[in-house]
């Protein structure tokens, strides 16, 4: 007896079609949760060596995949393009939907092998890579927002360091969102803030140079808002968020490197 389970996964639910020796014997819809998956599990247990096929739908099919792996069921996961090409021959009309029954019938035709399940560490690496990419995109967006708001409050500050980015720059932006915060402090206080703005070693000569340059830029600047403007808090917020994102992204990168070493 050959039993094929075709599963059409969507956002919150999945359509299940069960074919035995080529004939559909059952079909139903389950929620993508423990209750729904347990109903599917009950049917899987009634047959020997069930063939399970579904289309990869990103994060939506991830839970079904994890459930099947937890109970040691082999499955065939099709990428969307592969599914479309292989199922076109089973459609009466080109506009017909790829559904669970068609997925199951296609397995009878193509006899696909089960999808190779990699070690968990590889899934972790893919998740970390996606997380890293998302944080990189967040960093770019936040940098652009900081740049725009600084054009109103203290655009000259972007010229203090060689590049307007990184730990020291963002710390200085938080300390000096507009020129008044520079000109209201003594030179010794400014030197101390610059000294504390970086976790790296910085020479006294460099500190003195940056202090003099900062004062010059502040005197040159014309701020379009008052010291009480909420835009100054916005400047600080973006700078603080950039620090947080940068630090967190480095943690993720270190984790990726460590896990990659363990794969070898």
Annotate each PLM feature.
Residues 1-264:
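A detector of single, family-specific signature residues
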């Amino acid at each position: 007896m050959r039993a094929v389970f075709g599963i059409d996964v969507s956002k919150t639910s999945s359509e299940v079609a069960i074919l035995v020796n080529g004939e559909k014997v059952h079909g139903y819809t389950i929620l993508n949760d423990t209750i729904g998956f347990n109903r599917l599990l009950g049917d899987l247990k009634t047959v020997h060596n069930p063939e399970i096929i579904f289309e990869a739908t990103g994060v939506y099919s991830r839970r079904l995949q994890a459930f099947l792996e937890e109970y040691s069921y082999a499955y065939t996961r099709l990428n969307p393009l592969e599914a479309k090409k292989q199922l076109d021959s089973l459609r009466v009309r080109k506009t017909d939907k790829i559904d669970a029954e068609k997925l199951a019938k296609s397995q009878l035709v193509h006899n696909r092998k089960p999808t190779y399940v990699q070690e968990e560490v590889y899934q972790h690496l893919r998740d970390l890579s996606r997380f890293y990419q998302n944080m990189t995109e967040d960093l770019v967006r936040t940098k652009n927002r900081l740049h725009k708001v600084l054009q109103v409050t203290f655009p000259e500050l972007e010229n203090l360091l060689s590049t307007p980015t990184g730990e020291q720059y963002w710390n200085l932006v938080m300390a000096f969102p507009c020129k008044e915060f520079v000109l209201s402090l003594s030179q010794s206080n400014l030197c101390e803030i610059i000294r504390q703005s970086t976790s790296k070693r910085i020479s006294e000569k460099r500190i003195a140079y940056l202090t003099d340059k900062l004062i010059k830029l502040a005197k040159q600047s014309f701020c379009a808002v008052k010291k009480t403007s909420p835009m100054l808090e916005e400047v600080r917020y973006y700078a603080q968020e950039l620090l947080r994102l940068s630090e967190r992204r480095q943690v993720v990168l270190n984790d990726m490197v460590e896990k990659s070493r363990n794969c070898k």
